[in-house]
Amino acid sequence: SSDVCSSDLVTYDYIKSCFLKTGHNCPTKYKMPTLKEALAVCKDRIVVNIDQGYQYYDLVMAITEELGVTEQILIKGKKSVDFVDAQAKKYKHAMMYMPIIDINKPSGQDLFRQYMDKKIIPLAYEVCWQQETSEVKKCMKDILAQGSKIWVNTLWASLCGGEEAGMYDDYAFEHGAEVYQKVLDLGTSIIQTDRPELLISYLKKIGRHN
């Protein structure tokens, strides 16, 4: 269930006693894993995005270093270039880092400008926008010219152009996977989705997925 109780009532031991449910609300035999347990399963297999995790950077690093999976971990954030650099230098190994650029907002525009001015090329940028503006188009163009990649999150409309743009997952589910072509036409090469089967089937259809 997605319902959350008071933290005073839901203890770690209580969470460990619960069983996960399917999308149809049927209980399974599986329980909630800790981050350490989940990463142990993922070791040497996949890249793991620790979503909303930058504020827990040191805690995450302690776990990943113990397991030897640090270089498999992707973490994203909105901190300044200098802050991120100083944080990474504290450790022998580094997680992959990706800036999140809210390009419709002054703070996001400022962060993007830092990367451009310092000529820093991250592995990719997650670009978020609520409405189409000249800043959005220029941002996408500059990223590709720099030689980096564009990551677009299609989970919600507010992350990829708003309702009118029609680029988000539920819109694609209701109107057809061709919706994702609009995302690809921006130069996007990484799409974060809650509809992987729908997206992958479309990518295979157009020859963009092996």
Positions of the model-derived regions?
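Catalytic beta/alpha-barrel core
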Residues: P27-Y30, V47-Q55, G68-E135, S148
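A structural motif corresponding to the C-terminal end of an alpha-helix
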Residues: E37-V48, K182-S189
